[in-house]
Amino acid sequence: MTHDEPDSAAASALAVMERHLHALNGLRENDLADTLHFPHFRLVGTTLDCWPTAETYLSDFRARAGDHWARTAWQTIDVQRESANKVHLVVQINRFDINDQLIANFDSLWVITFKNGKWAVQFRSSFAAS
Protein backbone atom coordinates (compact mmCIF):
# COMPACT_ATOMS: atom_id res chain seq x y z
CA MET A 1 0.00 0.00 0.00
CA THR A 2 1.46 3.37 -0.90
CA HIS A 3 1.14 6.60 1.01
CA ASP A 4 -0.86 8.19 -1.82
CA GLU A 5 -3.69 5.65 -1.78
CA PRO A 6 -6.99 6.97 -0.40
CA ASP A 7 -7.02 4.73 2.68
CA SER A 8 -6.27 6.27 6.05
CA ALA A 9 -2.97 5.85 7.85
CA ALA A 10 -4.74 3.54 10.31
CA ALA A 11 -6.03 1.34 7.48
CA SER A 12 -2.52 1.18 6.02
CA ALA A 13 -1.08 0.21 9.41
CA LEU A 14 -3.70 -2.50 9.93
CA ALA A 15 -2.91 -3.90 6.48
CA VAL A 16 0.77 -4.09 7.47
CA MET A 17 -0.21 -6.00 10.60
CA GLU A 18 -2.26 -8.49 8.59
CA ARG A 19 0.61 -9.07 6.15
CA HIS A 20 3.04 -9.38 9.06
CA LEU A 21 0.95 -12.05 10.77
CA HIS A 22 0.49 -14.13 7.61
CA ALA A 23 4.21 -13.94 6.79
CA LEU A 24 5.20 -14.82 10.36
CA ASN A 25 2.87 -17.80 10.60
CA GLY A 26 3.94 -18.96 7.14
CA LEU A 27 7.62 -18.55 8.08
CA ARG A 28 8.10 -16.50 4.92
CA GLU A 29 11.20 -14.56 5.88
CA ASN A 30 11.28 -12.20 2.87
CA ASP A 31 7.59 -11.33 3.22
CA LEU A 32 8.06 -10.77 6.95
CA ALA A 33 11.05 -8.51 6.38
CA ASP A 34 8.95 -6.50 3.93
CA THR A 35 6.60 -5.56 6.79
CA LEU A 36 9.46 -4.07 8.84
CA HIS A 37 11.64 -0.98 8.54
CA PHE A 38 15.31 -1.55 9.28
CA PRO A 39 16.87 -0.83 11.57
CA HIS A 40 14.01 -2.40 13.51
CA PHE A 41 13.68 -2.01 17.28
CA ARG A 42 11.94 -3.97 20.06
CA LEU A 43 11.83 -2.92 23.71
CA VAL A 44 11.16 -5.68 26.28
CA GLY A 45 11.40 -4.59 29.88
CA THR A 46 14.31 -2.18 29.73
CA THR A 47 16.22 -4.09 27.04
CA LEU A 48 16.24 -2.55 23.58
CA ASP A 49 16.89 -5.02 20.76
CA CYS A 50 17.92 -3.77 17.34
CA TRP A 51 18.03 -5.59 14.02
CA PRO A 52 20.07 -3.44 11.62
CA THR A 53 19.06 -5.65 8.67
CA ALA A 54 16.54 -8.41 7.90
CA GLU A 55 19.05 -11.29 7.85
CA THR A 56 18.67 -12.44 11.47
CA TYR A 57 15.15 -11.31 12.26
CA LEU A 58 13.23 -14.60 11.75
CA SER A 59 15.81 -16.81 13.47
CA ASP A 60 15.80 -14.41 16.42
CA PHE A 61 11.98 -14.59 16.54
CA ARG A 62 12.08 -18.38 16.72
CA ALA A 63 14.53 -18.20 19.60
CA ARG A 64 12.26 -15.71 21.45
CA ALA A 65 9.03 -17.61 20.80
CA GLY A 66 10.46 -20.96 21.90
CA ASP A 67 10.48 -24.48 20.52
CA HIS A 68 6.76 -25.04 21.14
CA TRP A 69 5.58 -22.06 19.07
CA ALA A 70 3.38 -22.97 16.08
CA ARG A 71 1.49 -19.76 15.31
CA THR A 72 0.63 -16.27 16.50
CA ALA A 73 -2.72 -14.44 16.51
CA TRP A 74 -3.74 -10.90 17.29
CA GLN A 75 -6.39 -11.09 20.02
CA THR A 76 -7.07 -7.37 19.71
CA ILE A 77 -5.63 -4.42 17.81
CA ASP A 78 -6.62 -0.90 18.80
CA VAL A 79 -5.52 2.26 17.01
CA GLN A 80 -4.31 4.65 19.71
CA ARG A 81 -3.15 7.54 17.56
CA GLU A 82 -2.48 8.30 13.92
CA SER A 83 -0.94 11.01 11.79
CA ALA A 84 -0.25 11.16 8.07
CA ASN A 85 2.92 9.07 8.43
CA LYS A 86 2.76 7.30 11.81
CA VAL A 87 0.29 5.07 13.64
CA HIS A 88 0.42 3.71 17.20
CA LEU A 89 -1.33 0.37 17.72
CA VAL A 90 -1.94 -1.43 21.00
CA VAL A 91 -1.95 -5.14 20.25
CA GLN A 92 -2.79 -8.10 22.47
CA ILE A 93 -0.79 -11.03 21.12
CA ASN A 94 -1.48 -14.75 21.55
CA ARG A 95 1.03 -17.47 20.74
CA PHE A 96 -0.08 -21.08 20.29
CA ASP A 97 1.63 -24.46 20.17
CA ILE A 98 1.10 -27.20 17.59
CA ASN A 99 -1.94 -28.46 19.59
CA ASP A 100 -3.45 -24.96 19.42
CA GLN A 101 -2.91 -24.46 23.14
CA LEU A 102 -2.15 -20.92 24.30
CA ILE A 103 1.51 -20.63 25.33
CA ALA A 104 1.83 -16.84 25.65
CA ASN A 105 -0.43 -13.81 25.90
CA PHE A 106 0.93 -10.28 26.18
CA ASP A 107 0.37 -6.66 25.23
CA SER A 108 2.55 -4.70 22.86
CA LEU A 109 2.70 -1.18 21.40
CA TRP A 110 3.51 -1.17 17.67
CA VAL A 111 4.63 1.93 15.80
CA ILE A 112 3.93 1.73 12.07
CA THR A 113 5.53 4.44 9.94
CA PHE A 114 5.53 5.54 6.33
CA LYS A 115 9.07 6.08 5.09
CA ASN A 116 11.18 5.11 2.12
CA GLY A 117 7.97 4.76 0.11
CA LYS A 118 6.21 2.16 2.26
CA TRP A 119 4.24 1.55 5.42
CA ALA A 120 6.03 -0.86 7.79
CA VAL A 121 6.71 -1.55 11.47
CA GLN A 122 9.48 0.67 12.84
CA PHE A 123 9.36 -0.18 16.54
CA ARG A 124 7.48 -2.09 19.18
CA SER A 125 7.48 -2.17 22.95
CA SER A 126 6.41 -5.52 24.30
CA PHE A 127 5.36 -6.96 27.64
CA ALA A 128 6.36 -10.44 26.44
CA ALA A 129 8.67 -12.57 28.55
CA SER A 130 12.28 -11.68 27.77
Residue ranges with predicted function:
Residues 29-81:
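A solvent-exposed, acidic/Ser-Thr-rich amphipathic alpha-helical stretch
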Residues 36-37, 93-95, 125-126:
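Short beta-strand segments enriched in hydrophobic/aromatic residues
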Residues 74-80, 92-95, 107-113:
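Hydrophobic/aromatic beta-strand elements that line small-molecule binding cavities or substrate pockets
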Residues 103-130:
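Short beta-strand edge/turn micro-motifs at domain boundaries
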